[in-house]
Swiss-Prot record:
One Pfam family this sequence matches: HD_assoc
HAMAP family: dGTPase_type2
Residue ranges constituting the HD domain according to the UniProt record: 69-217
InterPro entries (UniProt xref): dGTPase, dGTPase-like, dNTPase_2, HD/PDEase_dom, HD_domain, PHydrolase_assoc_dom
SUPFAM superfamilies: HD-domain/PDEase-like
Transmembrane feature ranges: none
Lineage: Bacteria, Pseudomonadati, Pseudomonadota, Alphaproteobacteria, Hyphomicrobiales
Coiled coil stretches, renumbered: none
Protein name: Deoxyguanosinetriphosphate triphosphohydrolase-like protein
Basic and acidic residues bias locations: 22-32
Region of interest: Disordered: 1-32
UniProt keyword Hydrolase, yes or no: yes
Length: 404
């Protein structure tokens, strides 16, 4: 076996040697598996570097120690690899999916996504998973023979389906997409390169998705404590974190609040990882899938929180929503961020010359706002960092919110 070609440990794991391939054929690497190459391509992409200056919750200039999309992504990848290793899955595919999962987020996090979605209403809307797919299949320009990163089918599938199927067998949208339909970027690509939107994704993709949940919960608690939006003792309102805080107090009665918070975050991550592994092992023992295709056809997720952990995790999300995401300070800044995104879209719509040359309408292309030009503007704004969006707004407008 070649260097770097570690085989998956379990029959239900994805195997790079049996990948369904890439949209554009390439010779295999002598030193890296197909999934390792995907992982490396994501890391070296321009979109990945931009995550450094994209918001997780707090805008980039609010503090050097708050999480950005990049630090969050690295933390998701660490948790995902730990889960994959424990379950005998392909760690490289798992890591590639964890590293790619947030590439499509616009500046200012979910506030930016809401604003762009409103701006693109009538032109297909904006969905960050669809934008991730656009980035890795079209918008990255690093290779002479193709646009995008030419990732394997398995990585593209996981990018799109990590939260479950998007459609039924008749191609009718289901779940979160039932009302508005499958995002146009996903639907268009799926016609070229069938991602089987009706099936579940691989276990590696399911692991990356649940690692995202674990990282969000634990690290947003950490950032919320650091920002002073709530205190460690406020977390006693939930049974799981209350028990952990009590255990920390028993073992370290004189610990200061900073270290108590850090111990709580570590303990929460460890607890949720252990719970997921236990539940996954139980489900896999019951289902006994003999291949990754049997995983896809199983009809339900095999990676999940057990009921008690799912209830605890839902309570944590509800706490964070009330005490952090809807905190007046955060809401004020995010409202101003939405204004910046809407203003930029309107200016580029009304004055195409305000766009950089490479984003201008091509010769012969209509300068009226149609779906193609609206998407071009949306792609440009979605690729901005928080810092660039603020700087660009200052260039184009007399007054720009301070976002503080």
């Amino acid at each position: 076996m070649a260097v770097g070609m570690a085989a998956p440990h379990a029959t239900y794991a994805s195997d790079p040697a049996r990948s369904r391939g890439r949209l554009f054929d390439e010779p295999p690497s002598k030193t890296r598996s197909a999934f390792r190459r995907d992982c490396d391509r994501v890391i070296h992409s321009t979109a990945f570097r931009r995550l450094k200056h994209k918001t997780q919750v707090f805008v980039y200039h609010e503090g050097d120690h708050y999480r950005t999309r990049l630090t969050h992504t690295l933390e998701v990848a660490q948790i995902a690899r730990a889960l994959a290793r424990q379950l005998g899955l392909d760690e490289d595919l798992t890591e590639a999916l964890a590293l790619a999962h947030d590439l499509g987020h616009p500046p200012f996090g979910h506030a930016g996504e809401r604003a762009l979605d409103a701006c693109l209403d009538g032109y297909g809307g904006f969905d960050h998973n669809a934008q991730t797919l656009r980035i890795v299949t079209l918008l990255e320009h690093r290779y002479p023979d193709f646009d995008g990163l030419n990732l394997t089918w398995e990585t593209l599938e996981g990018v799109v389906k990590h939260n479950g199927p998007l459609a039924d067998r008749a191609c009718n949208a289901i779940g979160r997409y039932q009302r508005r339909g499958i995002p146009v970027g996903i639907a268009d690509f799926n016609r070229r390169h069938d991602l089987e939107l009706w099936s579940f994704a691989s276990l590696e993709a399911q692991v990356a998705a649940i690692a995202d949940d674990i990282a969000y919960d634990a690290h947003d608690i950490d950032d919320g404590l650091r920002a002073g939006l709530f205190a460690v003792d406020d977390l006693k309102a939930m049974p799981l974190t209350a028990a952990m805080i009590a255990d920390i107090a028993r073992r370290h009665p004189l610990l200061d609040d900073h270290r108590r918070g850090a111990a709580l975050v570590r303990g929460l991550i460890s607890h949720l990882i252990t719970a997921v592994v236990s539940e996954a092992e139980r489900r896999l023992a019951d289902a006994r899938p003999q291949s990754v295709d049997e995983v896809r056809r199983h009809g339900q997720a095999l990676i999940a929180f057990p009921p008690a952990a799912a209830e605890a995790e839902a309570l944590i999300k509800a706490f964070l929503k009330q005490r952090m995401y809807r905190h007046p300070r955060v809401m004020r800044v995010m409202g101003e961020a939405e204004t910046i995104v809407r203003d930029l879209f309107a200016r580029y719509r009304d004055d195409p010359a305000a766009l950089p040359a490479e984003w201008l309408p091509e010769d012969g292309e209509s300068r009226e706002l149609d779906a193609e030009r609206a998407r071009r503007i949306g792609n440009f704004i979605a690729g901005m960092t928080d810092r660039f969006a603020i700087t660009e707004h200052r260039r184009l407008f007399d007054s720009t919110p301070e976002l503080r």
